[in-house]
Every structure is written in C-alpha cells, then in structure tokens.
C-alpha cells in the first residue's frame, strides 16, 4: 500500500493520519478477508512495522461490527529481531527446506530488507539470516516439547479483536 505516512521523503516517517486508516479500511472492505497477517514486531528499530500495526489495528477496530469481520482472524508474526514467547504462540506453521528458501527469496524482493539492514540494532546479520535462524529456533523449541522435528517454523499470535483484546 502507498500509505501517506510513509511518503515523507525522509528516514523518519510521518505519524498515522486519517487517510492511512481510510486506505486500509477501503482495502479490507473490498477484500473482506478471512485472515489478515501483519508484522507484530514492535522491536523494529525503524518503527515502520509499529506504525503499520497501529494503522491496521485502528482500521479493524472501526470495521469490527461488519458481518464479514465475524469470520476474520488477525495473525501477527514477528520480524527479524524476536520470536513470540512459546506460551503466546497461537499458530505454528512447519516449514520445509524448500519453503525456507522461498521465504528467503520473498525477503529479497523487499528493497529495505536486502543486504545489510539500514537499522541493524546490535545485530549485523542480514534479514534473511535472522529470519531463518529465528524460524529454526522456533522449530527446535517445539521439538524439545516432544513435537515432530521440522526444518523451521513460522509462529503467529492471534489478535482477538472481536473480544476486545488490547495489545
């Protein structure tokens, strides 16, 4: 989406505006999704994921009384920095070696996530390396709990907006 908050021409992005929320609401109204996936990584030092998260949260809050939203689940995944604590994971999706490679190629399609991160924090690894290792560590946690061994796992936390959950 070409949201207005992002188009400042500067590293520091603008704040959330009504137009950002309206564009997002219009897309949700058009698609009437059963599932929405979003980056729930509030540790993102660049802050873009947090702004997008707040825009989507506000759009969903305003639309939650629509009938089609009764069947909509909002799933948050973590970015390159941290994983959800295992007790907060509501859905874990096993990834095969081919799916891990496909995810890496998808990361490469994002200009801001190629090569060395612009805002690496204390971690100089590339995004794909961080994501790969995070997904492998998640799979290892589940294996230690006695579940089948997988190459990697993507973990999601559900935002239960229908019940008024506050995050």
Roles of regions detected by a PLM:
Residues 1-70, 105-111, 124-129, 137, ...:
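Active-site beta-strand->loop->alpha-helix modules in alpha/beta enzyme cores, enriched
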Residues 61-89:
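Short, flexible loop segments at boundaries between secondary-structure elements
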Residues 3, 79, 95-97:
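Active-site donor-binding loop signature of nucleotide-sugar glycosyltransferases
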Residues 79, 85, 132, 160-165:
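Short, isolated positions within intrinsically disordered regulatory regions of eukaryotic proteins
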Residues 76, 101, 132, 155-156:
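Intrinsically disordered, low-complexity sequence elements enriched in Ser/Thr/Gly/Pro
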Residues 56, 74-77, 93, 156:
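Generic structural hydrophobic/aromatic packing signal, biased to beta-strands
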Residues 83-141:
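A conserved mid-domain beta-alpha-beta active-site/ligand-binding segment of alpha/beta enzyme cores
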């Amino acid at each position: 989406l070409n949201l207005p908050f992002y188009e400042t021409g500067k590293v520091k992005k603008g704040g959330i505006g009504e137009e950002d929320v309206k564009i997002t609401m219009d897309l949700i109204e058009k698609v009437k999704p059963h599932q929405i996936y979003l980056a729930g990584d509030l540790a993102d030092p660049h802050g873009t994921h947090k702004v997008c998260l707040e825009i989507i949260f506000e759009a969903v809050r305003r639309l939650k009384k629509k009938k089609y939203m009764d069947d909509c689940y909002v799933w948050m995944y973590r970015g390159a920095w941290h994983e959800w604590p295992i007790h907060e994971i509501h859905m874990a999706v096993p990834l095969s070696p081919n799916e891990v490679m496909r995810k890496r190629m998808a990361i490469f399609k994002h200009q801001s996530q190629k090569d060395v991160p612009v805002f690496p924090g204390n971690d100089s690894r590339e995004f794909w390396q961080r994501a790969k290792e995070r997904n492998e560590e998640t799979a290892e946690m589940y294996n230690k709990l006695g579940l089948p061994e997988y190459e990697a796992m993507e973990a999601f936390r559900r935002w239960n907006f229908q019940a008024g959950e506050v995050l």
